[in-house]
Amino acid sequence: MIFSLLFSLAACRGNSEQKVVDPVVEFDSAFYERLMPGLGGGITGGDGSISIDLKDGRSLFMWGDSFFGDVINDKRAKDTKFVIGNTFTIIDKNGQLKTLYSGTKENPLAFIEADQDGKSPVWYWPGHGFVENGILHLFMSKFHKVGEGSFGFEYLCCDYFRLDVETMKIIDKENFKAANENNVHYGHAVLPYKGEIYVYGTRADAMGVAEVHVSKAKLINDKLVDFSYWDGAEWQTDARKSQRIAGITKSVSEQFNVVELEEKIALVSQDRSGNVKDIYSFIADKPEGPFSNEKLLYKVEESGFEVDSMMTYNAMVHPQYRKDGKVLMCYNVNTYSMTKLFEKASLYQPRFIWVPVEKIVK
């Protein structure tokens, strides 16, 4: 399904040294409306909000669970279709949208479906990836249902997919075995850097405090091979020797970002075990760290946060979108109230902000 919008999302990469940079973080209330138009029957609610530059003038936005169907006056119909797993939106340089999912318009399903085990529902939530030579290299996390309620799910594994960027058809997939060897949830941040590909993930302890680990690989014949794992001092071929990256002083979200900004490596995350409303950044000179320069970039302020039983999580950076010395970011919001998801649709739509790059890297 393709929905046309009358706007343009051109990625601006101007020289910030020639402009006066507004030091204030700018809230962009219109951006999610561009990606989630209320009418047209497409995706009108979701989380994840992970983007990848497709390198052809288009960007891919990946959603976790999502709602389909019109939203009128911030309300959605009780029979609105809800998809567990993943759906994608592609937006081109002219602002035209293409929504990717399986199934039918009347019964939409996740775009990349997981094989079922016949015991409990199994699905993929999106990780991250990159594009090279017309191929999207994408990591997806597989989960299954283990109980009732919003958090009745369990991580199973990480799979590495390759897709044709033009058709978005799957070329192949394989299990990323390291994730089950060392319990690191790899693939939630992927960084191409100086001829190698760095794949990051978190490992949480029994209290939910998460540390960041990194592996790196070579891209040979359009496929990631020869993975090694950072042990805190050097790279090892044994995934079980992986150790946390030094210098990250906050518990990092399950989904987070590592991007290159102004020749610095920047990690951005919400505080997983502290105040989840706080969005932090750290910088390093190398992908494996050590990281430093902790910055509180933004504090989430939502009117009705308590009244609407809201939650916020998984801040994302969209480095392909730059303007006036700022980079586009977002954070996800949700509610513990299933009723409110229909009565107030905006409770399940990402919030976009423009953050001064200097605020991160200086």
Task: Identify the residue ranges that each predicted region occupies.
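Beta-rich carbohydrate-recognition and catalytic domains
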Residues: 17-44, 54-122, 131-181, 201-251, ...
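C-terminal motif of bacterial Sec signal peptides marking the signal peptidase cleavage site
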Residues: 8-11
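Bacterial signal peptide processing site
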Residues: 13-15
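Repeated scaffold domains used in trafficking and secretory/extracellular systems
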Residues: 49, 127, 180-189, 253-256
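Short alpha-helical segments and helix-capping/turn motifs at coil-helix boundaries
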Residues: 35-38, 44-49, 122-126, 184-185, ...
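Conserved beta-strand position repeated across blades of beta-propeller domains
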Residues: 52, 130, 189-192, 257-260, ...
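Extended, non-transmembrane interaction/recognition domains
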Residues: 182-186, 196-201
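Sec-dependent signal peptide recognition
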Residues: 1-4
